[in-house]
């Protein structure tokens, strides 16, 4: 996910494309883009790297791009889809055959040359649907899943990993760092995304080869970590501190964070934004844990015949689900019953939403809750309003941000999640139009943009958001909404 680096300024509208093509390490930054005059004809050519410089090529994905291009009448939308959908494959996937003769895939986030369990699982997710059409793509996906399982077994508390034991920028963090780790921020969702990816791969392909001893050991480590972070036996083994100017990059109370009461929920030291939680029972991530444990149980039962592990996964999922019903809901004076963002079990709660996924807004997208759930519908109205302290609205657009980038910065990811979870065509159309109008004429999505000027943005190369945009457009096409897309002016 995102990481704080020294701000750098990027140039005119081809800067993003040029740097993407060269895979330059200059992307290891976050910066606001100054205003510029964009060359009108820029949208006539795609901004993908040259074919010879693309890291991974899938014929099935290329065929799908052509199919969708032919259906889209809006030239800019077709151009953006062409740039964004393959961005993970073009620029971040490092596929190889390991020393054991098996596929191994290391996936950069984009400008940061490390592999986040969350980002990598989300980045390759929309390609799973093509696995049966492309043997090399299928191998690449096996490589991602295998790498993720190995990472979990190296350290189930880490969020991001290096390509080998090479150390990195955060080795001085006051936690149990290892040279294989890029960062060791404990985030519940880091253990959920690999299960989600493996489950979807299994459902699409029927391939059970990935569910080996490494998989079983990873599930054991996930269960151990989740249980420890229920805090029933004290604070557990994990603590984290960093010498930093950013308060949300470290934990309070000597690295343990704010206290929680053991009520069955799982504590998460950090959010999917990599920011520290205020109250450690992070509600969207606990919902994600429930659905992930149930998926793991289904695999373990059907493939591994691990009866005891199946029972453990189901029991923990049930326990967390009961606790969510009791502690996650708040009776808001304006919106009625809504889900809180964070709670501590003592009765304290934080009412907000952050753009990063899992979020309250994104819960139906992840399959954690039904979009027509009454409490979710109330929550959705709340988070997309100025009653959410991290909802911003300006001349360029509106959406949810978060403390990671700060005031007045809207994350396109939140706009995408509004579209993904919407049951209203006008709302979907408005979201797509907003995304098209806030790309700063680069043809790519960015981490965030300033509410009054999309040419001021952070992270020119953020593969997850790019691929997620492509995933959204493809879903709308496949859902029969091509007329809606073609009606956008």
Where are these regions (language model features)?
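Bacterial N-terminal signal peptides that target proteins for export
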Residues: 2-13
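Bacterial N-terminal signal peptides
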Residues: 11-22
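Low-complexity, Ser/Thr/Pro/Gly-enriched N-terminal "stalk/linker" regions
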Residues: 29-118, 143
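Well-ordered alpha-helical scaffold segments within catalytic/enzyme domains
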Residues: 60-73, 122-135, 193-208, 287-306, ...
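Extended, well-ordered alpha-helical scaffold segments
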Residues: 80, 135-151, 208-227, 296, ...
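Aromatic-rich carbohydrate-recognition surfaces in CAZymes
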Residues: 113-141, 145-248, 462-477
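Extended ligand-binding clefts on enzyme/binding-domain cores
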Residues: 117, 153-157, 161-164, 170, ...
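C-terminal capping/lid segments that line or modulate ligand- or cofactor-binding pockets
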Residues: 173-179, 184-187, 350-370, 408-489
């Amino acid at each position: 996910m995102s990481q704080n680096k020294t701000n750098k300024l990027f140039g005119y509208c081809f800067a993003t494309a040029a740097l993407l093509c060269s895979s330059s390490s200059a992307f290891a930054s976050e910066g606001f883009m100054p205003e510029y005059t964009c060359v009108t004809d820029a949208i006539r050519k795609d901004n993908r790297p040259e074919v010879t410089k693309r890291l991974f090529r899938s014929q099935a994905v290329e065929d799908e791009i052509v199919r969708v291009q032919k259906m889209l009448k809006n030239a800019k939308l077709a151009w953006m889809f062409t740039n964004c959908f393959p961005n993970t494959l073009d620029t971040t996937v490092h596929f190889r055959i390991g020393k054991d003769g098996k596929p191994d895939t290391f996936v950069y986030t984009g400008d940061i040359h490390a592999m986040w369990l969350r980002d990598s699982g989300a980045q390759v997710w929309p390609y799973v649907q093509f696995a049966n059409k492309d043997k090399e793509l299928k191998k690449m996906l096996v490589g991602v899943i295998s790498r993720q399982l190995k990472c979990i077994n190296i350290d189930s508390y880490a969020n991001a990993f290096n390509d080998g034991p090479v150390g990195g920028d955060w080795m001085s963090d006051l936690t149990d760092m290892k040279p294989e780790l890029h960062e060791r921020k404990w985030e519940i969702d880091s253990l959920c995304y690999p299960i989600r990816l493996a489950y979807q791969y299994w459902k699409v392909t029927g391939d059970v080869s990935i569910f080996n001893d490494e998989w079983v050991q990873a599930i054991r480590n996930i269960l151990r970590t989740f249980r420890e972070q229920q805090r029933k036996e004290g604070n557990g083994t994990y603590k984290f501190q960093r010498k930093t100017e950013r308060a949300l990059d470290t934990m309070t109370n000597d690295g343990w964070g704010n206290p929680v009461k053991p009520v069955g929920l799982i504590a998460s030291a950090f959010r999917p934004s990599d920011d520290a939680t205020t109250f450690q029972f992070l509600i969207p991530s606990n919902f994600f844990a429930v659905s992930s444990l149930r998926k793991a149980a289904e695999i373990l039962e059907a493939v591994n015949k691990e009866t005891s592990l199946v029972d453990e996964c189901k029991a923990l999922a049930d326990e967390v689900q009961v606790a969510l019903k009791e502690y996650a809901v708040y009776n808001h004076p304006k919106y009625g019953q809504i889900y809180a963002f964070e709670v501590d079990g003592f009765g304290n709660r934080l009412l907000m939403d952050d753009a990063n996924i899992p979020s309250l807004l994104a819960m139906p997208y992840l399959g954690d809750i039904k979009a027509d759930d009454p409490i979710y519908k109330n929550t959705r109205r709340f988070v997309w309003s100025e009653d959410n302290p991290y909802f911003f609205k300006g001349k360029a657009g509106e959406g949810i941000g978060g403390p990671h980038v700060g005031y007045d910065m809207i994350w396109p990811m939140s706009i995408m999640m509004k579209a993904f979870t919407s049951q209203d065509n006008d709302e979907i159309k408005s979201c797509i139009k907003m995304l098209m109008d806030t790309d700063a004429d680069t043809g790519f999505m960015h981490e965030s943009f300033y509410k009054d000027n999309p040419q001021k943005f952070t992270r020119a190369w953020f593969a997850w958001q790019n691929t997620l945009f492509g995933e959204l457009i493809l879903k709308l096409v496949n859902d029969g909404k091509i007329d809606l897309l073609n009606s956008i002016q």
